[in-house]
Structures are given as structure tokens and as C-alpha cells.
Design a protein with these regions (language model features):
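Extracellular/lumenal mature domains of secreted and surface-exposed proteins
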Residues: 1-127
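Phosphate-group recognition and catalysis centered on beta-loop-alpha active-site segments
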Residues: 26-30, 108-382
């Protein structure tokens, strides 16, 4: 780019003066620019070159057997998606005005399925399952929001989404923990009294604590970082990141981690009805997938106007046929079967869940995903 450097000069005697100089900076070597080196299948990946002068054309080979494509300059972009999982070598043959040529190469690894593509192609006769806090047995066997719990969800093979919660440490790291304090879900009170606010501890300091199960048993599990979670599970399951609307959670920091892990098309940011954060996510390049909450028509209309929005959550008591139909007209409806109603379902009372199925709910968040999968299979919803 072009820059103007200014220097304010103050002499020993006399008045201050300002000097300025214009500088132009350009790349001296061509390099391939890719929006995501680790995309999901069907994700739209953007390819281009850096701002290299003297480029007269580029021939692109995406390494998957698709037809070569051409661009006329370094600044021109191309979008490509991969249909199947695998590792691909992308080649860009660059032609220069002086007659020279150069071949650039980049490795791309595609895994899992694009969340946006899957939502746009959702089968309305089916229902997805989201594991609340990564629970499989309501957090009694494995602690909520633990790596062990998330692994169990993936092993089950019936969980499309894991819901987890994000918090920010004293040194700005993003971790996965339901509360913004430590006493309920860790063994913090074995060391100190009080609640222990997450924001008062660095990531290193949090490393001494261990997560607890729902009934308070201390496990061997540490509090995971969001980066650890996404790097291990990208391409295996999608994530719903709760708490992105909270004032003590930096949406910018959460977004940065998701982007760095190549998961912007594998994750949605739950922001409830926070229009400021919805607007911020929609303005990013690439955009973050917005996951709103709406219990009223005016909120639904307002939040559905943002993009990209593929799913809209509603509270259990509002999830009747008429309201679910209104949500489904704009996005995919999501509701919860948790707490007493979730326990009743586990004990064999399917009345509430029967109503959700009849209403046309598209995804159910629950603490018993294996049992939910069995129930939904019996109703032809899987």
C-alpha cells in the first residue's frame, strides 16, 4: 500500500515543524492467499495471490480433478469447494509481463461437512441432536465441557452438534466452561473459598483445577481451551458456542480463535438477541455464523434479518407448532429438553418430546443424546 510517514521536529529554539514522506510498499514475491487451509467439504474457499505487480494471468489447479480456472491478475479471486474429504495440492501457474512464469503450491486438507451447506440442504423430515455441554449421561459419568465428554459424543456417532460455553481468562485466552466462575464445575473450593472468577486467573493458573461431574465428583479433566477443542474435533462434529452475548466475553477473541482453527464454517456463535454482536459477526470477512434466540415475532423478524443465520433457538415453553412453523419459515428451529423435562424423558416420559416432533423442531438440545437418537429413530427422524 501507499503510506505517508510524518515526523514532528522540535528544535532547541523556535517552533515545531512537520516533515513528511510518501512511501509505496509492494510485494516482491508472489504468494498464494487462501481463506482456509483446513476447510470443511462444500465450504467455499477463496483463493487469490498477494498484491504482486506485473502479473498478467494465473492458471489454477485445485488438485481435485476439477477443471482448471483462469484469472487475469493477482488481485482477482476465485472460490472453490471440495466435495470429498482428503488432502489436495493446489497449484497456481503465474505468468508475468516480462515473459517469466512461476508455479506456486499450497496444501489443503478438507474434513467434515460445511455447516452452512448442511443447513441449506437440511432434510426437514429429520431432526439433529445437540449435546448440551457435551453431556451424554447428563454429566454424571464425564464432566460437562470436558475433552473426555466431547470425545464420548463423537464416539457415539449420533451427535451433530456439541454445545459448549466460552469464557475469557485474565490473560485473554478463550476457555470452555459454563460459568464465569470456578466453584460450581471445578475443585476450586478445595484450594480457596468464594466463587473464583475466571477473569481473575491466567490460563496457566487455571491449569491446577480439575473439572467436576454434575453430582460434584472431581475428575482428572482440566478446563480445555477453545483452541484445543476445535483443533481436535474439527471435521468430526459442529459446535454451538454459548455465552457469546455476555459482556465479559469478547466476541472478537472468540472469533479469532475460531478463524485461526479454520472452523468458521463448523461453528455457530450463540448471541441470543444481541443485535450489536450479530451485526459485528455479519461484517467480518469471513463472516461468523450467527445463532440467535427468539420467543417473539418482533425478535424473530429482527434477528432473522442478519446473515448468515441458519438456526434460531426458542425456549421450551414457546416451542408449539405455530411458533416453530414461524421459525422454520426463516431458519431451522432449535429448542431444549433439559433439567426436569430432560430427566423425565430419560425415565421414559416422552410427552414433551412428542410435541416437539409433531411441531417440526429441527434440532433438539439435550443431555442424553444416545437415548434421544434411539427415540428419534423409532419415529423415523434420523
Amino acid at each position: 500500500g501507499d503510506y505517508t510517514v510524518k515526523a514532528a521536529v522540535t528544535p532547541v529554539a523556535g517552533s515545531m515543524s512537520e516533515l513528511s514522506r510518501s512511501i509505496s510498499v509492494s510485494d516482491t514475491e508472489a504468494a498464494m492467499v487462501v481463506s482456509n487451509d483446513f476447510p470443511a467439504c462444500r465450504e467455499e474457499v477463496v483463493f487469490s495471490l498477494n498484491r504482486m505487480t506485473g502479473v498478467t494471468g494465473v492458471s489454477w489447479d485445485f488438485g481435485d480433478g476439477s477443471e482448471r480456472r483462469q484469472t487475469a491478475s493477482a488481485s482477482e479471486t476465485l472460490t472453490h469447494s471440495y466435495a470429498e474429504e482428503g488432502r489436495y495440492t493446489v497449484r497456481a501457474e503465474v505468468a508475468y509481463a516480462d515473459g517469466g512464469t512461476e508455479t506456486l503450491m499450497r496444501q489443503i486438507e478438507a474434513a467434515g461437512l460445511s455447516l452452512s451447506w448442511a443447513c441449506r440442504n437440511f432434510d426437514p423430515s429429520k431432526m439433529w441432536i445437540m449435546a448440551h455441554r457435551g453431556n451424554t449421561k447428563n454429566g454424571y459419568e464425564l464432566p460437562p465441557n470436558s475433552m473426555a465428554a466431547f470425545r464420548r459424543c463423537v464416539e457415539l456417532g449420533c451427535v451433530e452438534f456439541i454445545e459448549t460455553d466460552v469464557q475469557i481468562t485474565k490473560d485473554g485466552e478463550v476457555i470452555c466452561l459454563h460459568d464465569n466462575y470456578l466453584s460450581r464445575f471445578t475443585d476450586y473450593n478445595d484450594y480457596a473459598s468464594g466463587k473464583g472468577m475466571v477473569a481473575d486467573f491466567t490460563l496457566e493458573e487455571l491449569g491446577r483445577f480439575r473439572l467436576k461431574t454434575t453430582d460434584g465428583k472431581v475428575s482428572d479433566q482440566k478446563i480445555p481451551t477453545l483452541e484445543e477443542v476445535l483443533m481436535e474435533f474439527r471435521g468430526k462434529v459442529w459446535f454451538n458456542l454459548d455465552k457469546c452475548m455476555e459482556s465479559d466475553v469478547s466476541i472478537e477473541k472468540v472469533y479469532d480463535v475460531v478463524e485461526r482453527c479454520g472452523c468458521l464454517d463448523r461453528v455457530q456463535f450463540y448471541i441470543s438477541d444481541d443485535t450489536d454482536r450479530a451485526d459485528w459477526l455479519s461484517r467480518q470477512k469471513p463472516q461468523g455464523i450467527i445463532a440467535p434466540h427468539a420467543n417473539k415475532e418482533e425478535v424473530l423478524t429482527r434477528m432473522a434479518a442478519y446473515s448468515p443465520v441458519y438456526m434460531i433457538q426458542t425456549s421450551t415453553q414457546y416451542a408449539g407448532a405455530s411458533w416453530i412453523s414461524s421459525i422454520n419459515a426463516r431458519a431451522l428451529s432449535v429448542t431444549n429438553l433439559l433439567d426436569d423435562e430432560g430427566q423425565a424423558f430419560y425415565n421414559g416420559n416422552t410427552t414433551v418430546m412428542d410435541g416437539f416432533v409433531s411441531a417440526g423442531v429441527r434440532m433438539i438440545q439435550c443431555d442424553y443424546p444416545a437415548e434421544m437418537d434411539e427415540y428419534l429413530r423409532g419415529r423415523g427422524k434420523r
